[in-house]
Swiss-Prot record:
GO terms for cellular component: ciliary transition zone. It comes from the Eukaryota. It comes from Homo sapiens. The gene is CC2D2B. This is Protein CC2D2B. GO terms for biological process: non-motile cilium assembly; protein localization to ciliary transition zone. SUPFAM superfamilies: C2 domain (Calcium/lipid-binding domain, CaLB). It holds the Pfam family CC2D2AN-C2. Gene3D superfamilies: C2 domain (2.60.40.150).
């Protein structure tokens, strides 16, 4: 025991000392970088010191024992015999450690290595010697060795962060963040989603998203890591091996479930009029029985069918159809009818006198003969087609049998030819011809003009020789089957499989299994015979009877479920015929040994082009009937309906004393109900009811002795319920009372239905459809829709609040009312008729305004006059050998310029300028009007276009017209005529000429802008794309205006237009008084008074002082102005160019979608959101955009104000004015463009109002055009201010947040949206070209995709250096015309409309190819910039 304990102690101490003491000593020696000789010296020194200690201690204690001397001598001899051990550092240290391993105290504080090999040999001398040596050596260790050699020091500690850094240097931990597709795919390759292209992709295993991301990051660290990714950018993986199973999973939990917690499922049952027969029948018969006879199964297709049996099954089906048609014998019946009509016509023609009645009969006969002949031909054609199909199928079967060398089916087809009696046929035809001749002779004798009748007779009685079908197929099962030994190996295996298959059927009654058939084998003709009768005794009402067909081979599987109908009460045992119910199974069975399988496509050998995919199908033959007892009585339960029970219950109840039962209150209703139900009068259950019905019939029209209110209800109704339901005004009143109608909040309800347009109800229905949540669209599109719906709801609630406190004046109701304030105004009105007329100085008269009630469809037209254009780009081609190389035009609107590239091309090659043939198209409401084609870069048309206009709902009131959201497009095109010579045509032949139009630019303005103003007139800058392939600027330049010489406008196109509505429509502005709110403060009241005074001075100028927020609270407009931070992403793009940063911020604001036009912009209420809500919802009106842009400019310390005015092309607008060092700049938030104050082409027409965070200023200058306005609002003679100067210093608390928090746009959703837009545009282009094929040039599309990202910020060259050579290669073979268009993302439909307006799809030149690329640049908060590059390519001839 002591020896074993000692060995255990040595092992523990050695393990502990090995980890601490040895490591410390080794680390010290390693740090001093001692070589092997120094280590040996240290070992010798230590060993000598130990020996000296031993000698001294032994001298003091006395002489050693013989045992100790033996041990020392043994140790000394072994040390001499092994000099290599002394040289080793580890062995010298272990020698020292071995001399102190037996101390008990050392095991508590140190860890040692195992004992030396020589030490155990000392223990073999005896147990007694060991015990003596133990105590002495332990004391020696404590006193001498431990105190001199071991040193006590603090433990070394290493920081956790340093350990982590060391681990990171050796261990790679992949990130769980998602990886973009560009890193996983080859360069310039877009992900390809096969599912979106219509391919079937099997379901892949579900993997945790973070795990998948880690795996992708780990693979990308490898050199060949991209080979692990597929075309879609996902890791390639096999489909999931887990298949969904319908097997029930047992509860395998060990602990038993509390029985009180178990759910007991019970089937819902009807009210107990006796679900059980036993409880209901009392003493009557209680046993009812159904007899189910299951005959067998017949498979119309089986997975063990070979191709011959597939054809035989088809032949059987065709033969059954042929037999059915032969039984119907429709063709023969029509032939006999035709013969009878011919005989009747013959008899009528033989009559000597033809009266009016006879002529009508003859005409009717002729029509019937014609129709009957057509029907006969149709039915005869069906019979012939069916016969041909039978013969063709039989021919395939014979060919297949001959090819495979054996016969698998006993089917045999024989065709018999039936001889017809030709005499009867010739006789019938001769009779028809004689009838026709006699009819014509009589008409000539009578001399009557029966041209129409003779025409019909001659046309319809011309009956050709009828050739009846003389072939009759007969199908038999007499063909001899090939013996098994003579068949192929595959056929032998297939027949062996047939013998192994067995089937059985389970019978379920009311979802409970009641019986099961015996297992029957499958025969070679694929029939399974059961022939078993099952007697089902009923205790509950029969609800459903289900038969489950099972297939049994190596395993049992469910093949199909069959639900058979319950028999009626006349179907008794022995009197029912067999019935058939079809079944099918979608079970997938792969073919193996010559069979075709099931649910697997295959090709017929007889017809290699016919591909079939058949499912396992067949039919079950059975009969279900009610059984008979010993006496021959049917065992059928008598049904008892709910109404009969109520009648029996209320048999003796007085009708007048029970007012709660409606059918007993009104005898007439009870009488009508009894007639509709058709109650059996012989049923004793209804005896009392039939007595009442008989009594009512005999009573007739006797007046009852009691009063019935329902009988007099019609007299109380002033109009019928049908007319009330059709009344439009009544429907509107109901909707307004329910608070669901917003259109008539600020106007009275029309009195007559004719004044109410149907558009009101259409808008209400469409509004309800839009409010339904959208689930099948992109999340960004869904955000746009939800934001618009949210703003509509907010506006609706605030409008209801305004209506409650608004009051209308007389002028708001009476349109013709004109208030005369004083007598002087009356005198002026009279003097107008007396003052002289000066012909040389005519006075301008205002156009007469027409009221909406006097306008009908066709009275209103939009007049658009196209005067002339300036600086239209011209076509430019370069001559390089025999090839024409097109160049491209760069617009000055975009920052993308390539003048150096163009100059280099021009210097190297010879250039010549082609002429341009421009024309203008005006488009409104999908109707296009075109001007004549002019010539040159500065054409003059001077043409007036009258655009037809029809208001939706035929309502021409201003409120209805203001709902029209359509735009008026004025597009400039270049007409090109191209001739194409066909290859097969001679040189002298003239080629085909094709006209194509190339889009050059457009001017767009909404219809609402034209409605608000009397006219739109002037010279406007045309919006042209940044790049126009194939075009360049003209060398000649004409200044559009005299005051535009100083500006550099050589790279701009201008168009002079005039547009108006004829006649002008009058409208009434509704300005509700908003000063009746209970929570009005002194400042808000002052603002309302200030607004009234300003409107009195200049009624046509805009002034806004107070608005409502999205919570319906009224605020001063100055509280919306506050410096707010723009997105940091925009600030990091142009770090050293502040002007470019301001332009980018203005562009960012213009990309936020605008709120659709309000139902009536003259409702006098303004609802503005804060800038934070405008950014978060990604939608806003014009004023909210201007406020947001102003707040961004204030963030940079610029002096900015919001300007309210009127634009020529946009109507009411809101601009931002910034004061620079020497000038004022006008920023348009809707387009992001900046204009100088004295820019003649600035679309701003009037400056009406300014406001910032301190005050509101109203423009009281007589001329309010931007070029004439003096913007120093400190001058009170020019600007009228709302707040006095003593109040301006104290800033009012803003309702804007301290800062706006932005979030990044999901790039995966942006990519998904880009793919959707690109697919939709391609399908639309093909849809717009129904008569021409549409070919897409992939190489050009690839190049355009590389160009688009560089156009967003206008950086880089037109084509990249990598794609330059590829683009030049395309230009060598194609004439390329195209352009990019840019727009903010609102919805997909707006992008489709913009592409359609360019007309690039209208190219009719054959073999025209197209290229289309879409790029979406994401900004924060789902604000997107959409670029669409369109190009058409025509191959050089």
């Amino acid at each position: 025991m002591k020896k074993s304990q000692r060995e255990d102690i040595f092992k523990k101490m050695s393990e502990e000392m090995d980890n601490i003491t040895a490591e410390e000593i080794i680390d010290k020696h390693l740090q001093k970088d001692l070589d092997a000789e120094e280590n040996q010296n240290v070992a010798k020194t230590l060993r000598g010191k130990v020996r000296e200690k031993l000698k001294i201690s032994k001298i003091n204690k006395g002489e050693k024992s013989s045992t100790e001397q033996l041990i020392d001598s043994e140790i000394h001899q072994r040390s001499k015999l092994s000099p290599q051990t002394e040289v080793s550092l580890d062995e010298s240290l272990s020698f020292f450690i071995l001399s102190g391993e037996e101390g008990s105290a050392l095991g508590k504080s140190s860890e040692q290595r195992p004992v030396n090999r020589s030490y155990p040999k000392c223990f073999s001398l005896g147990v007694n010697l060991q015990n003596v040596a133990e105590s002495e050596e332990e004391e020696f260790m404590k006193e001498f060795i431990l105190t001199d050699i071991l040193k006590v020091k603090a433990a070394d500690y290493e920081d956790d962060q340093e350990q982590i850094k060391k681990q990171k240097a050796n261990i790679f931990v992949p990130s769980s963040s998602p990886v973009v597709n560009q890193r996983k795919l080859p360069k310039d390759m877009m992900p390809r989603i096969l599912e979106d292209e219509g391919f079937y992709i099997q379901r892949k295993p579900e993997i945790y998203k973070k795990t998948c991301n880690k795996m992708e990051n780990r693979l990308l660290k490898l050199e060949e890591g991209k080979c692990w990714f597929g075309e879609s950018g996902e890791i390639m993986s096999l489909p999931t091996p887990i298949k969904q199973s319908w097997n029930f999973r047992l509860n395998v939990r060990k602990e038993p479930l509390n029985p009180l917690l178990k759910t007991i499922y019970r089937k819902a049952v009807k009210y107990d009029l006796g679900s059980s027969f036993m409880n209901k029948m009392e003493g009557s018969r209680e046993i009812y029985q159904l007899d189910l006879n299951i005959v067998g199964l017949q498979f119309s297709h089986h997975h063990l069918f070979n191709q011959e049996q597939v054809l035989c099954a088809r032949l059987l089906q065709l033969y059954e159809c042929f037999q059915d048609r032969q039984q119907q014998n429709v063709s023969q019946l029509l032939y006999e009818k035709l013969k009878a009509l011919t005989d009747a016509t013959k008899l009528s023609n033989e009559n000597s006198e033809i009266n009016q009645l006879t002529r009508k009969s003859l005409q009717d006969y002729y029509w019937q003969i014609s129709n009957t002949k057509q029907m006969y031909d149709l039915e005869r054609g069906k019979d012939l087609s069916l016969l041909h199909s039978i013969l063709r199928t039989w021919k395939q079967i014979k060919s297949l049998r001959h090819g495979q060398g054996f016969t698998s089916t006993p089917i045999k087809l024989q065709v018999q030819r039936i001889k017809m009696n030709k005499c009867d046929e010739q006789e019938q035809i001769s009779e028809m011809s004689e009838t026709e001749k006699k009819n014509e002779g009589k008409e000539l004798k009578n001399g009557k003009k029966l041209e129409s009748l003779s025409y019909l007779a001659s046309d319809e009685t011309e009956i050709e020789r009828i050739k009846p079908i003389t072939l009759r197929p007969q199908l038999s099962f007499t063909a001899e089957l090939t013996s098994l030994s003579k068949c192929s190996l595959h056929e032998q295996k297939r027949r062996a499989k047939i013998q192994k298959l067995k089937y059985f059927i389970k019978i379920f009654y009311n979802n409970k299994q009641v019986s099961c058939t015996s297992v029957s084998p499958l025969q070679f003709d694929f029939k399974v015979m059961f022939q078993q009768i099952f007697n089902i005794q009923l205790m509950y009402w029969p609800e459903v009877i289900c038969l489950e067909v099972y297939e049994k081979s190596k395993r049992t599987s469910l093949l199909a479920k069959l639900y058979i109908p319950l028999p009626n009460y006349t179907e008794l045992k022995g009197k029912t015929a067999l019935q058939y119910v079809e079944f099918s199974s979608d079970k997938l069975v792969m073919p193996a040994d010559g069979e075709v399988g099931s649910n697997v496509p295959f090709l017929l050998e007889g017809n290699g082009t016919e591909e079939l995919c058949l499912l396992t199908s067949g039919k079950l033959s059975y009969s279900l009937s009610w059984s008979l007892d010993e006496n021959g009585l049917p065992l059928i339960p008598m049904p008892q309906s709910l109404r009969s029970s109520y009648c029996s219950m209320l048999r003796n109840v007085d009708a007048r004393s029970v007012p709660g039962i409606p059918w007993l209150m009104n005898e007439q209703k009870l009488f009508e109900w009894a007639n509709e139900v058709r109650i059996d009068p012989n049923n004793p259950e209804y005896s009392d009811l039939m007595e009442s019905v008989t009594y009512m019939r005999l009573k007739g029209q006797d007046i009852p002795k009691y009063f019935r209110l329902e009988q007099l209800q019609d007299e109380f109704n002033f109009v019928s319920e049908e007319e009330m339901a059709k009344s439009k005004r009544f429907q509107l009143l109901q909707l307004r009372n329910a608070g669901q109608l917003d259109n008539f909040l600020l106007q009275q309800m029309p009195l007559h239905d004719t004044e109410i347009p149907d558009l009101v109800f259409q808008e209400y229905e469409s509004q309800k459809e839009k409010e339904v949540s959208v689930s099948d669209v992109n999340s960004i599109t869904a955000q746009r829709i939800n934001s618009a719906n949210f703003l509509k709801k907010v506006r609706r609630l605030i409008m209801k609040r305004i209506v409650k406190i608004s009051k209308c004046n007389l002028s708001d109701i009476v349109n013709d009312y004109e208030e005369i304030v004083s007598t002087s105004q009356l005198t002026d009105a009279v003097c107008k008729f007396v003052e002289p007329r000066r012909k040389l100085k005519p006075q301008r008269k205002e156009r007469k305004k027409v009221t909406a009630q006097a306008i009908s469809d066709g009275d209103i037209k939009i007049l658009v006059r196209i005067v002339r254009a300036y600086n239209i780009p011209t076509r430019k081609t370069t001559i390089n050998g025999s090839l024409d190389m097109p160049t491209c035009l760069k617009s000055s609107i975009s920052c993308l310029r390539h003048r150096e590239t163009i100059k280099s091309v021009a210097s190297d090659e010879t250039l010549h300028e082609d002429t341009v043939h421009p024309f203008v198209e005006v488009s409104f409401q999908h109707t296009v009007y075109k001007t004549n084609t002019a010539s040159g870069s500065h054409p003059c048309w001077n043409e007036e276009i009258k655009v037809d206009f029809v208001s939706p709902g035929h309502d021409y009131s201003f409120s209805s017209l203001s709902k029209i959201k359509d735009n008026i497009y004025i597009n400039i095109f270049d007409e090109m005529m191209t001739e194409k010579h066909e290859d097969h045509c001679l040189k002298s032949c003239s080629g085909h000429s094709y006209i194509r139009k190339n889009w050059l630019g457009c001017i767009v303005f909404p219809f609402s802008a034209l409605l608000q103003q009397s006219e739109i007139s002037g010279t406007f800058q045309v919006t042209i794309p940044p790049v126009l392939l194939g075009y360049t600027w003209s060398n000649t330049y004409v200044f559009p205006k005299e005051d535009s010489n100083e500006q550099n406008l050589k790279e701009c196109t201008f168009l002079n237009i005039f547009a108006t509505i004829e006649p002008q429509i009058s409208y009434v502005t509704c300005n509700p008084t908003l000063d009746k709110f209970l929570d009005q403060t002194e400042v808000l009241q002052r603002a309302q008074i200030f607004k009234k005074n300003c409107k009195a001075m200049f009624p046509n100028r805009r002034i806004v002082t107070t608005v409502f927020n999205d919570e319906g609270i009224q605020f001063l407009v100055t509280r919306y102005i506050k410096a707010l931070n723009p997105p940091q992403q925009l600030l990091d793009i142009f770090l050293h160019n502040s002007n470019a940063t301001f332009d980018l911020i203005a562009r960012f604001v213009s990309l936020i979608p605008f709120v659709p036009n309000t139902p009536d912009e003259n409702d006098g209420s303004d609802i503005w959101m804060t800038s934070e809500h405008c950014i978060s919802l990604a939608i806003g009106n014009k004023e909210e955009h201007a406020i947001l842009l102003c707040n961004f400019f204030l963030y940079f310390g610029k002096k900015a104000l919001v300007l309210l005015g009127t634009s020529v092309l946009e109507g009411h607008v809101a601009y931002v004015v910034t004061q620079e060092t020497n000038e004022y700049l006008l920023w348009n938030p809707s387009t992001g463009q900046c204009y100088k104050q004295f820019d003649p082409f600035c679309p701003l027409k009037s400056v009406d109002c300014l406001f910032d965070d301190r005050n509101v200023w109203f423009n009281i200058q007589q001329n309010n055009t931007p070029m004439a306005v003096f913007f120093d609002y400190s001058k009170e003679s020019f600007w009228k201010q709302l707040l006095p100067k003593n109040v301006q210093g104290t800033k009012i608390q803003s309702i804007q947040p301290e800062e706006i928090i932005y979030f990044e746009t999901d790039k995966s959703m942006v990519e998904d949206l880009r793919n959707r837009i690109e697919r939709t545009l391609k399908s639309k282009v093909m849809e717009w070209r129904p008569k021409h094929p549409t070919h897409w040039n992939r190489q050009c599309t690839f190049i355009l995709r590389q160009i688009l990202p560089k156009l967003e910020f206008g950086i880089g060259s037109f084509v990249s250096s990598e794609g330059d050579n590829e683009f030049e290669r395309i230009l060598q073979f194609y004439w390329v015309t195209g352009f990019p268009i840019q727009m903010p993302y609102i919805d997909v439909q707006s992008i489709i409309d913009a592409v359609y307006q360019t007309g690039i799809h209208s190219a009719e030149f054959p073999q025209t190819e197209f290229a289309l690329a879409v790029y979406i640049h994401p900004y924060p908060n789902n604000i997107l910039s959409v670029w669409v590059y369109l190009a058409s390519l025509v191959q050089h001839q």
